[in-house]
């Protein structure tokens, strides 16, 4: 008899409280140098909520969080949720200009940040550069809604209120007052604004409701990927990114333990997973998983408890990881900030061959449509086009960007993802790249991802990224940036020769640029192609 899956929809605050009531002593979060139980996290989150209320933050207010992965980060996240506020996680790698823009655009009334020896940078210094007026008294002129600057890790200094002073204010607000605020939060109320970079000059804030950020992740962790026991989940990425935040929320909702670190280092990650018996891993991106399996200390026996590993990668890498971890199932998926993370994923019952080449099928409660990017007409199965998504998980819109929101939805409420997919007759989805990542070579459409996947069939190539180079005759031609496996040697001509006669001539890269592992320009989680295009433009002036 098939398992009955109950659709349980909760607010973000409720997700924590239920698990804290069910198993208060279980560890909710473990880092190499810190940990917190569900009971402790519940109490810390209430203390943050009470303190925020004490300084004047109210339901619906936006609260920015600029803290690396840590206990402080998650107590801030849930503290804002319990109060009924809207959390605005900030990228800890952003520089002053980016932070200044987001703090102003988001209309955050408070900022929870950190000044700790473990921080990658001195956040108060960068914030002073971003918002010079915080060095003075009065209104923060660069972000006029911002009234409270709080160091959730650190001591009071200037305009910044330190942890001890901030939490002391909680004594003026009762826990019952926060309980009343929590119970008033509705499932479709905003929970998060996740800023995502794209082709626009500034990041766009995706407004996500409580149902969007809890329903799918919790259902997956409890049922679809459930093993009968609370999961032990490892997340490689920063918790300001939906790709890591979503599995974290799922872990909390399933009463599991989430493993992470303030930064990714493969040896530390392996040791953490081995020590705590990881069952579900979310490395997501090729650079992360390659760092794991290529590390000198890697031994499949270290991950003997692993059941599932999520990865988005070319089939050659998926197959390699699956071969190295035969006891686990490698699963691909697709998602983005605008869809609160995953909107489709492979089923564990699918063959490994299918999971290597597809991104699975739409999740429950989510619809997809494949359309012609030019005309918007729906396309038949087997034809590549832009994938549109509609469902409970889709954002309500881009914050304070009505025009961009209108451009991103059609008249029937379908969100235009900008991703290219082909739907197979069995509803599985095959990724074809980004609409804006298509090259036009002499009138022929070339998907960069197709050439990248072929380049990775070369035994010496570890990573490949393809971009277009302007060409006076063909409009543009493909060129490739590649990273070789350590110790391998191959020249440009050999790689180009590998392509000739095996892919169409117009798809063959016209030039190969070799990259060391440390040379790739990175966004929060993946290689930044816009930076590669800028580098190419400089190189070919």
Predicted regions and their residues:
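Conserved beta-loop-beta connector loops within the AMP-binding
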Residues: 367-388, 407, 425-426, 488-492, ...
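Conserved AMP-binding/adenylation subdomain of ANL enzymes
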Residues: 81, 214-232, 240-280, 295
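Conserved AMP-binding/adenylate-forming core of the ANL superfamily
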Residues: 6-9, 13, 17, 25-70, ...
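A short helix-loop-beta submotif of the ANL/AMP-binding
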Residues: 62, 68-88, 92-96, 101, ...
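Structural core segment of the AMP-binding/adenylate-forming
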Residues: 55, 85-165, 488
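Gly/Ser/Thr-rich phosphate-binding loop
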Residues: 167-168, 253, 275-284, 290-354, ...
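AMP-binding/adenylate-forming catalytic core of the ANL superfamily
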Residues: 94-100, 111-113, 391, 396-397, ...
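Conserved adenylate-forming
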Residues: 55-57, 170-189, 193-235, 246, ...
